[in-house]
Amino acid sequence: MATGKTSSAANLFTGSTRFDLSSADSPPSKLSLSSDQLNHCHQALGVFRGKIQNPDSIAHEFTGLQANRMWPSELLLNSTVAMNSVNVEKNRYSDVVPFDKNRIVLNPCKDSSAKGYVNASLIKTSESESISQFIATQGPLPHTMEDFWEMVIQQHCPIIVMLTRLVDNNRTVKCGDYFQDEDGPREFGNISLTTKWIKTTDTSLMLRNLEVNYKETEDQPMSVLHIQYPEWPDHGVPKDTVAVREILKRLYQVPPSLGPIIVHCSAGIGRTGTYCAIHNTIQRILAGDMSALDLAKTVALFRKQRIGMVQTMDQYFFCYNAIVDELEDLTAGTNAGTSS
C-alpha cells in the first residue's frame, strides 16, 4: 500500500465524465475525508459495531428477509420477457432472471422478438448523481457474450467487477470466457475487444485494462477497468474482507456519473448482491445518507430489483463485517468530531 498518498473524497460527488485508467494498476490511495464525512463514519461505525456484538439481531434480520422473498409464481408474473421462449436459453439459471420493470434493454438489438433481452438488472437506491448505480448480471454464456459487450457499450459502463472464477474447483463452468488473457484483439460479432494490460495485486485481484469498440467505426475505443476476484467461493464468503474492500477502494475515485458499475458472479445475486450492498452502504454514509445504516432495508430494496440479492446468512454477516472493517479504515487515527 502506498504511504502518504491521499486523495479527496470530493471526487465521489462530482459530475465528472472522465476516468483515467493510466494509474488504475497502482495501489489505491487513502481518502482524505471532510469533518462531516468523518463524523458520519464514526456514527455509522458505532451502529454497525453494536449490531456485530449482537449476532442474533443480524440473523433475525436475514430471517425476515428470507420470509419476505419472492415466490417462483411471482417471478413468472414479473419477468415475462426473460421467460419468453426466444430468451429462455439466454439465462444461466432458470430461477434467476431480471424483472421486466428494471431489466437492461439492448437497443438496437439483432432480434426484435427478443425485445433487447439480456439477463441483467439495474440496481439503485436513489437517483442521486453522487451514488453509484449497478448492473447486476449473470456470468455470460458463450452465446450471450456479444450481448454482454453490447450492454457495456450502450450503458457506458467504465467498470466490470467479476466475483467468480470461470470454472470452480469442482470443474463446473461458472462463467464464459468473455475476455482474454493475452494481448491482441478478440471479436464478439460486431464488437472488438483488446486487453491492454493485466496486473495481479497482493490480495489476489486481477486487474485488466480492456478496450472495446464496434469493429467498423472510427470512434475512439471505450476503456474498461475489469476487476476480478477469483477467490470468492460460490454461496460462501472470503476468509477476510481485505480483497473485497480493495475493490471498493479502487472505485472510490470513479465518478458515478460515468455510468453504472457492472457486477457479476455466476448467477448475479449472491456474491454480486453482497458486494453491491457493501459498496452502496459505505458510499451513502460518506454522502451523509444515514438511512444506509439500515442494511436490511437496503437488501430488501435490492431484492425488489433482482431476486435473491445477498443469498445466504453468511453473506449477510459478511456485509456487516466488511462495512465495519472499511469504516475502521476510514476513521483510523481520528476521533469523532475532528478532521485530523
UniProtKB/Swiss-Prot annotation:
The active site is at C265 (phosphocysteine intermediate). Changing C265S: Loss of activity. Phosphorylated by KIN10. Inhibited by hydrogen peroxide. Expressed in roots, stems and flowers, and at low levels in leaves. Induction: By salt treatment. Down-regulated by cold. Substrate binds at D234, C265, S266, A267, G268, I269, G270, R271, Q311. Its main location: cytoplasm. Keywords: Cytoplasm, Hydrolase, Nucleus, Phosphoprotein, Plant defense, Protein phosphatase. It is found in: Cytoplasm, Cytosol; Nucleus. SUPFAM superfamilies: (Phosphotyrosine protein) phosphatases II. It comes from the Eukaryota. Its EC number is 3.1.3.48. It catalyses: O-phospho-L-tyrosyl-[protein] + H2O = L-tyrosyl-[protein] + phosphate. The keyword Phosphoprotein applies. PROSITE patterns: TYR_PHOSPHATASE_1, TYR_PHOSPHATASE_2, TYR_PHOSPHATASE_PTP. GO terms for biological process: defense response; intracellular signal transduction; negative regulation of defense response. It is an enzyme of class 3 (hydrolase). Residues 58-326 form the Tyrosine-protein phosphatase domain. Changing S8D: Disrupt binding to MPK6. Interacts with MPK6. Interacts with KIN10. Protein-tyrosine-phosphatase that dephosphorylates and probably inhibits MPK6 in non-oxidative stress conditions. In association with MKP1, represses salicylic acid (SA) and camalexin biosynthesis, thus modulating defense response. May also repress MPK3. Dephosphorylates and inactivates MPK4 in vitro. This is Protein-tyrosine-phosphatase PTP1.
